Amino acid sequence: MKLADVEERMQKSVEATQHDFNSIRTGRANAALLDRVMVDYYGTETPLRSLANVSTPDATTILIQPYDRSTLASIEKAIQLSDLGLTPNNDGSSVRLNIPPLTTERRKELVKTAAKIAEGGKVAIRNIRRDAIDHIKKAGKAGELTEDEVKDLQEKVQKLTDKYIGKIDALLAEKEKDIMTV
């Protein structure tokens, strides 16, 4: 196992955590809120983004314009069933989502959700570290690496772990600030 592979896997964990953060509502309209919404399209669960153009005409509105108008009702239903807590307004050709301002209580809940997402990302990075260190130890026992090389590689893996956990902490701090800003 190469350090570059370990670093790439850790970077992907950070990117996945960032993607999960983007799905948290912050009080401003953000098309990424709808990334996880799946629409029943002729019996198949299909991502909303592949059925419609999603835009944010202003800071409090998301506009969904389906490529096929027959999907309007399905899109509306999928949004209602999602955990976003938003009410869709169907005007016959598009669906509008008005983003209400968040209450202080809801903001605190969202900060807790963000912390859980961050912890999930950190756990993924720690698992990558554990796998890498196990691999290094096996190589050391097999005689492929000297004791000094094993120790050196373990230190490098730990430094990578610290670096990427720091990145997740920074993303979390940024998201918390974003959520708590009125």
UniProtKB/Swiss-Prot annotation:
It is found in: Cytoplasm. One of its GO terms (molecular function) is ribosomal large subunit binding. Gene3D superfamilies: 3.30.1360.40, Ribosome-recycling factor (1.10.132.20). GO terms for cellular component: cytoplasm. Keywords: Cytoplasm, Protein biosynthesis. InterPro entries: Ribosome_recyc_fac (IPR002661), Ribosome_recyc_fac_dom (IPR023584), RRF_sf (IPR036191). The keyword Protein biosynthesis applies. GO terms for biological process: translational termination. HAMAP family: RRF. Responsible for the release of ribosomes from messenger RNA at the termination of protein biosynthesis. May increase the efficiency of translation by recycling ribosomes from one round of translation to another. Belongs to the RRF family. This is Ribosome-recycling factor. The gene is frr.
